[in-house]
Curated annotation (Swiss-Prot):
UniProt EC number: 7.1.1.-
Subcellular location as annotated: Cell inner membrane
Protein name, UniProt field: NADH-quinone oxidoreductase subunit A
Subunit description: NDH-1 is composed of 13 different subunits. Subunits NuoA, H, J, K, L, M, N constitute the membrane sector of the complex.
PANTHER family: NADH-QUINONE OXIDOREDUCTASE SUBUNIT A, NADH-UBIQUINONE OXIDOREDUCTASE CHAIN 3
Length: 134
């Protein structure tokens, strides 16, 4: 049964057994040698020597998520352009025209986002009408 197993399989099996043994040894030594503090503050969160104050839940503005989504969208599109730039000689003029149309669509999308105010970090200030209506 063990004669038909190749040397590579034996080496992998020894590696897996060794990795599991090292993990179990470290967990066992930590359990044996680790300190056992009992008291009120055992279950209290500890962060870099500073006692925690307040809640851990923070509210983030939706602008953070919008910026992250825009980054992902334009980053993926940059990857498409990188793939095109690698094969620019093989794609010829047809590929160049397609890439130009693609870049144009990206610019149209960017202008649209800019026009609707999605890229502005602070809210728009209301415009005051200074017309005298006497």
């Amino acid at each position: 049964m063990f004669a038909d197993i190749s040397a590579q399989h034996w080496a992998f099996a020894i590696y897996v057994i060794g990795a599991i043994a090292i993990c179990l040894t470290m967990i066992g030594l930590a359990a044996l040698l680790g300190g056992r503090a009992q008291g009120r503050t055992k279950n209290k969160p500890f962060e870099s020597g500073v006692d925690s104050v307040g809640t851990a839940r923070l509210r983030f503005s939706a602008k953070f998520y919008l910026v992250a989504m825009f980054f992902v969208i334009f980053d993926v599109e940059a990857l498409y352009l990188f793939a095109w730039s690698v094969s620019v000689r093989e794609s010829g003029w047809v590929g160049f025209i397609e890439a130009t149309i693609f870049i144009g669509l990206l610019l149209i999308g960017l202008v649209y986002l800019w026009r609707i105010g999605a890229l502005e970090w602070s809210p728009r200030k209301p415009q005051l009408n200074n017309k005298n209506t006497d």
